[in-house]
Amino acid sequence: HIELGADKNLDNIPFERIRQDIIAQYLRGGLNTVSWHLNNPLTGGDAWDVKTAGVVTSILPGGAKHDQFIGWLGKLATFLNSLTAPDGKKVPVLFRPWHEHTGSWFWWGRSHCTPQQYKELWKMTHDYLSKHGVNNLLYAYSPGGEDKVEDYIERYPGDNYVDLLGFDCYPSADVQGTDAYRKSMTTVLTYLTQLGKEHNKPIAVTETGLEALPIADWWTEVLFPLVDKYPISYVLVWRNAREKPNHFYAPYPGQASAQNFVEFYNHPKTKFCSDIKNLYK
């Protein structure tokens, strides 16, 4: 909750630790992605508090909570501007604001604002951060895995405000869930490949993963065949939660899919941080 001036994020990780880890990943030659699950400025609830209408309206210019929200953006800008390497250079970050907006579980989601209001929110965020010296961001647009390209692009703020096209897509662990996941991933990656060409933007799977990884060969038999066919920049799996033992998306030693993940890691067509040289040159 950086917008509140808290010292820890919603996963109870100190922001100073996050800052240090972002810099360390950059020094290793890797890329950091950052999302923002900010509180509901109208109710004081969390990002999932969608009981009250008009939250986005309230923070746009002229809204009752606009000044408060601008203060929140200021705190975010301070943190992003603090991401500097030992040589003084700012650390590049892939910033993924207002994500999964085609769903309605966040207060900035589809049912809670118009397409125009969403675009205004995105542009206001972008312009404020740019004006306040945050010049180390690449902006990622990441709706949910929409079956129709029209739904994907409906709230797109424009090529001048977006650097990468992504999407978030998750399966359930049963056979039906895996089949539906394959279908959804294929549908989105097919049209996203075309959109990337049309808009001259790289594409990515900005969130995915199988919770608790009960399918032992998920990495090589489910995920890899899906992403192998398309020109994606990266695929990101979600977090391993300290406070929820079964809420994890990357394996640990001895976990059912751990050996399969090693096979995935060693595949000649996958690249991890140690495989990438001179990303920033």
Where are these regions (language model features)?
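Aromatic-lined glycan-binding groove of carbohydrate-active enzymes
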Residues: P157-V162, V188, L192-P202, I232-S233, ...
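Aromatic- and acid-rich polysaccharide-binding/catalytic face
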Residues: Y152-R182, W238-N240
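Active-site beta-loop-alpha junctions enriched in small/polar residues
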Residues: E3-G5, H37-N39, W98-E100, S142-E146, ...
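Aromatic-lined carbohydrate-recognition surfaces of secreted/lumenal glycan-active proteins
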Residues: V93-W98, W122-D151, N200-P214, V237
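Substrate-binding cleft of extracellular glycoside hydrolase catalytic domains
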Residues: D7-N135
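Extracytoplasmic/secreted cell-surface and envelope-processing proteins
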Residues: D7-L10, L42-G45, S104-W107, K148-Y152, ...
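Substrate-binding cleft of secreted/luminal carbohydrate-active enzymes
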Residues: K201-K281
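Alpha-helical scaffolding within the catalytic cores
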Residues: E16-Q20, L76-F79, P143-P157, K183-L195, ...
